[in-house]
Structure formats: C-alpha cells, structure tokens
C-alpha cells in the first residue's frame, strides 16, 4: 500500500499535500485515542479497581484543555467515601 502511495505521488506530485494531511490527521486521531484510553479516568482496564475516578484529587487535571482553571489552587468540595 505504501508502494502505491509513493508511486501515485511520483506520477502526480499535486497529491503530495493530500497524502500529508491525511497522514497527519490519521496520526493525530490515533494519538488522541491512545491518550483517552490510557490517561482518562473514565476508562477502567483493571477490573479489580472498579472505580478509578474516586482516586482523583481536586488538584488533578484530567481534561484535555481547560481555559482559566488553575488546578493547584482548587479546594476540596466533595465528601470522602
């Protein structure tokens, strides 16, 4: 398959940006899914620990992007179970 892509790129150089953008998008999507699977507290791979989200403290950042929140200054607002 890679040989076909390289062959098409040699025959039609105008397709090179298309291949670059598709490859970049596929790589970014794969890395984002890997990040969600490994670092998201809602995903539980180990069945012996059924609720991993209860171990997160109020200072843990688990969002991908937060605009104006400084997690180091947050107070604990939830009860202990």
Curated annotation (Swiss-Prot):
GO terms for cellular component: mitochondrial inner membrane; respiratory chain complex IV. Residues 1-14 are mitochondrial matrix. It is found in: Mitochondrion inner membrane. It holds the Pfam family B12D. Its main location: mitochondrion. One of its GO terms (molecular function) is protein-containing complex binding. Residues 38-81 are mitochondrial intermembrane. The modification N6-acetyllysine is found at residue 10. It is a single-pass membrane protein. The chain crosses the membrane at residues 15-37. Keywords: Acetylation, Electron transport, Membrane, Mitochondrion, Mitochondrion inner membrane, Phosphoprotein, Respiratory chain, Transmembrane, Transmembrane helix, Transport. The modification Phosphoserine is found at residue 66. Component of the cytochrome c oxidase (complex IV, CIV), a multisubunit enzyme composed of 14 subunits. The complex is composed of a catalytic core of 3 subunits MT-CO1, MT-CO2 and MT-CO3, encoded in the mitochondrial DNA, and 11 supernumerary subunits COX4I, COX5A, COX5B, COX6A, COX6B, COX6C, COX7A, COX7B, COX7C, COX8 and NDUFA4, which are encoded in the nuclear genome. Component of the cytochrome c oxidase, the last enzyme in the mitochondrial electron transport chain which drives oxidative phosphorylation. The respiratory chain contains 3 multisubunit complexes succinate dehydrogenase (complex II, CII), ubiquinol-cytochrome c oxidoreductase (cytochrome b-c1 complex, complex III, CIII) and cytochrome c oxidase (complex IV, CIV), that cooperate to transfer electrons derived from NADH and succinate to molecular oxygen, creating an electrochemical gradient over the inner membrane that drives transmembrane transport and the ATP synthase. This is Cytochrome c oxidase subunit NDUFA4.
């Amino acid at each position: 398959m890679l040989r076909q892509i390289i062959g098409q790129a040699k025959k039609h150089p105008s397709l090179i940006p298309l291949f670059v953008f598709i490859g970049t998008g596929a790589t970014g999507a794969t890395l984002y899914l890997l990040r969600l699977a490994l670092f998201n507290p809602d995903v539980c791979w180990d069945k012996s620990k059924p609720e991993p989200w209860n171990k997160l403290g109020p200072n843990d950042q688990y969002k991908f992007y937060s605009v104006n929140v400084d997690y180091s200054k947050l107070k604990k607002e939830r009860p202990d179970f």
